[in-house]
Amino acid sequence: MADEKFSNFLTDIIDADLAEGKVDVVHTRFPPEPNGYLHIGSAKAIFINYTIAKHYGGLFNLRFDDTNPAREGDEYVQSILQDLKWLGAEPNGGIFYGSDYFERCYEYAEQLIKEGKAYVDDLTREEMQEYRGNDAGKPSRPSPYRDRTPEENLDLFRRMRAGEFADGEKTLRARIDLASPNMNMRDPTIYRIKHVEHHRQGDKWCIYPMYDFAHPIQDAIEGITFSLCSLEFENHRPLYEWVITNLFGKEFPKQREFARLNVTNTVMSKRYLRELVEKNIVDGWDDPRMPTLSGLRRRGYTPTSIFTFVKEAGISKADNLVDMRQLEAVLRAELELNAQRRVAVLEPVKLIIDNYPADQCEYFDLPNNPNRDANDTTTRKVAFTKELWIENSDFFEVPPPKFKRLTLGSEVRLMGAYLVRCTGVDKDENGKVVAIHAEADLETRNGNPADGRKVRGTIHWVSCAHCLDAEVELYDKLFTEANMNSIPDDADFKDYLNPDSVKVLQGAKLEESLKDAKPGDRFQFVRNGYFTPDSKHEGVYNRIVTLKDSFKL
């Protein structure tokens, strides 16, 4: 039985079926089509199917729904495998390919033909739409080819397989109910002709089963008991059940639907995401601004944060829009505890300590993680020299109100080091400050002044002689519109792209201990946010999330 920590309407259904002895094993599957990269919405489907199977001690399959050869490819297969491995969603039931069942699907199609439950149709796609009517009250009418004999249909279907006909010249349709209010039941197409090479089967096939026909067959063959999918397939459930009943004569697999995960300021449509990639609007499917799992991974998100976010967003029957800041808040809480601290000056200006020896270098011990809950008391040594880099924004000649950092004549603490007082500045011919001069109170090493005077603030720094150069990329939301599902149907989604979705900072200065950092490492750059080395470009750091946000969990 589902415990209170993981209980929802889906587990209620499963609990009832288990209690009544209808099933012995809970067996689920995640069936992505390998025609694009998985995204944060896919993570919800993975989470539900994987977690439910694990919760009941059952089985979880990964099945590639590769029944449409037009856009499918091994690149997407490999990315999906990598994503599931990264998420830790091990398919303990096995990894399968829908294309491996093509022969079985074909045999089941012939069975329906022989039983008079399927027929070969010559109507074009446009003609078929006209004949089927619509769900607004326009009645359907039978195709002129609906009453072909099983023998004629079987002959034509076998000739379709043999490649005698062109794409679209003929289809195989299930004979169900032309008067059904559900359009999916009005003699749906279950096979079409496509003279396209398949990424696994090559040119062996030129007819391919439709998803609504292949999917229930694949579920039944694999022993799936609960086919859990997103809400857009709810109207397809009667067809799913028709296939299961007519070919297998049993109640299970059972299809049930849950609401999709929609997130603010992004799009989930593979068509839209592919357009962004193909038009070079983004840096590939794994661009850190993309909602793809590979993009989130490159950005620095963790598998734990994604699954926690999905769980907190909830499992319901009603579509909802979840604020992206909720995911950021989940990750921020994790990184606050786990990320080691490092110093990085993103927009540097030079600070010269005039009373510090030019040939001297000393090291200060700075904590790796001062968070009390982290139980990390380790430190690292950071070099201190006469010339330092500080943030340009930490100095003002004419400070704004309540400014507590460095100004002419004021005193601040250099984090973990000395108190310094600004004595002057150097400017270029345009009047821009290029260097700041200060004097250090050398009696305040790692401590407070003996006279107890108050300092205005604390700023971070790195040594000019002991630092790394880096490029830093600060990411923001990809789209300006929060709910991209609400834009007008005739609108171009690209018109809503955020022109400020990334800010690139050249010439950032990082403490030298980061020389061994690698992609997948995550750091808090003190006072600047959480960052990770980019996995594509050496010497580039991506901001994962800011230090703070007004959003509260």
Task: Map each language-model feature to its residues.
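N-terminal catalytic cores of NTP/NDP-binding nucleotidyl/phosphoryl-transfer enzymes
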Residues: F6-D15, A19-Q82, E197-S230
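Secondary-structure transition/capping motifs at alpha-helix termini
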Residues: A19-K22, T51-L59, K85-N92, A220, ...
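Intrinsically disordered or highly flexible coil/loop and linker segments, enriched in small
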Residues: V23, A118, A166, M183, ...
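Conserved short loop/turn motifs at secondary-structure junctions
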Residues: P31-N35, R63-R71, G94-E103, E126-E127, ...
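Active-site cores that bind ATP or allylic diphosphates and position pyrophosphate for catalysis
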Residues: D66-N68, D74, Q111-L273, L327, ...
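A glycine-rich helix N-cap at a beta->alpha junction
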Residues: Y76-E103, Y108-A109, G116-Y119
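Long, charged, mostly alpha-helical binding arms that flank functional sites
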Residues: P253-V330
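Substrate/cofactor-recognition hotspot
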Residues: F309-L553
